[in-house]
Amino acid sequence: MKQSMHLIVRGAIAAAAFALASGSALAASNLQVVDSHSVSLFTAAGGAFGSGSAISPTLWEVKYDSNTFLAFCLDPHVAVSNSSNSYSSGAFAASDSVKRLYEGYYASSIATVSTSANSAAAFQLALWELNNDNTNLLTGDLRFKNLSNAVVSQANTMLGVATGNGAIQNLYNYTSLTSVNPASQTLLAVSPVPEAQTWAMLVAGLGLLGFMARRRKGASALT
């Protein structure tokens, strides 16, 4: 649990710093895979982006623009390439269903990856469904004959919440990482939105800095 919490805190802090730098698109920068958390390959017998494709939903830990953070895949048809690692970043317009998925399950899904990747894998399946398919794991391009697999069953539960009518709290900022070469998959990273109290402290701090600067300038003019 200590290792899991360390991963969450480290990822959250790095992603928060990364998000502050990503209010607008950044120039292409090198992306390096630091670690990955996935389940064993299993087959979507009904057809996963092709009849009987073997898939392994994965949570990635990556280093980009001097920051290390966690990211999920947005493009299920493309693998992460070790040779095509030049990426650009920009704000991602998350749908309401994707926001509900993150607000309901992101924190808990990444909390257990050091001991089990099942929740993270289920989260990845749900994200693929919401962003690329028809939100139904029994039909569409990504489909299964049944929901008996533990990861698929958990993903189905997540989809039920994500496509529901739950209130959206806008807890995260969303940033997409897109490979300059389309041969490598697009990734999605998030960072917590600072609470109102945090913003108030930041504004107050900036105001104090401005006041001190004006005071020093005034003192210089008198001497």
Residue ranges with predicted function:
Residues 13, 102, 217-219:
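Sequence-pattern detector for short linear motifs
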Residues 28-190:
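Short, surface-exposed polybasic-aromatic patches that bind anionic ligands, especially phosphate groups
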